[in-house]
Protein backbone atom coordinates (compact mmCIF):
# COMPACT_ATOMS: atom_id res chain seq x y z
CA UNK A 1 0.00 0.00 0.00
CA UNK A 2 1.56 3.28 -1.14
CA UNK A 3 1.91 6.15 1.32
CA UNK A 4 1.79 9.80 0.31
CA UNK A 5 4.91 11.93 0.12
CA UNK A 6 6.45 13.44 3.25
CA UNK A 7 4.72 16.74 3.92
CA UNK A 8 7.70 18.50 5.52
CA UNK A 9 10.04 19.71 2.77
CA UNK A 10 12.53 21.95 4.60
CA UNK A 11 13.17 25.37 3.08
CA UNK A 12 14.91 28.07 5.14
CA UNK A 13 13.65 31.01 3.11
CA UNK A 14 10.02 29.92 3.31
CA UNK A 15 10.44 29.17 7.03
CA UNK A 16 11.67 32.72 7.66
CA UNK A 17 9.02 34.30 5.46
CA UNK A 18 6.13 32.44 7.03
CA UNK A 19 7.24 32.32 10.67
CA UNK A 20 10.01 34.93 10.90
CA UNK A 21 10.33 37.87 13.26
CA UNK A 22 9.72 40.57 10.66
CA UNK A 23 6.60 38.80 9.45
CA UNK A 24 5.30 38.53 13.02
CA UNK A 25 5.89 42.23 13.65
CA UNK A 26 3.75 43.15 10.64
CA UNK A 27 0.38 42.36 12.18
CA UNK A 28 -1.14 43.11 15.55
CA UNK A 29 -1.77 39.41 16.15
CA UNK A 30 1.83 38.60 15.24
CA UNK A 31 3.12 41.17 17.73
CA UNK A 32 0.85 39.59 20.35
CA UNK A 33 2.43 36.18 19.66
CA UNK A 34 5.94 37.58 20.14
CA UNK A 35 4.86 39.41 23.31
CA UNK A 36 3.32 36.23 24.74
CA UNK A 37 6.51 34.28 24.04
CA UNK A 38 8.57 37.04 25.72
CA UNK A 39 6.30 36.91 28.79
CA UNK A 40 6.66 33.14 28.94
CA UNK A 41 10.43 33.51 28.76
CA UNK A 42 11.00 31.64 25.51
CA UNK A 43 14.61 31.44 24.37
CA UNK A 44 13.48 31.52 20.71
CA UNK A 45 10.76 34.04 19.89
CA UNK A 46 10.39 33.21 16.21
CA UNK A 47 11.72 30.75 13.65
UniProtKB/Swiss-Prot annotation:
GO BP annotation list: translation
The keyword Amino-acid biosynthesis belongs to this UniProt entry's keyword annotation: no
Disulphide bonds in the chain: none
Pfam annotation, one family: Ribosomal_L34
Listed GO MF terms: structural constituent of ribosome
Keywords: Ribonucleoprotein, Ribosomal protein
Region described as Disordered: spans on this chain: 1-28
Any single GO CC term annotated in Swiss-Prot or TrEMBL for this entry: ribosome
Family: Belongs to the bacterial ribosomal protein bL34 family.
HAMAP family attached to this UniProt entry: Ribosomal_bL34 (MF_00391)
Protein name: Large ribosomal subunit protein bL34
The organism of origin for this protein: Corynebacterium efficiens (strain DSM 44549 / YS-314 / AJ 12310 / JCM 11189 / NBRC 100395)
This protein's encoding gene: rpmH
Amino acid sequence: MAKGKRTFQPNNRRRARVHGFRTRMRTRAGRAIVAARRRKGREKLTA
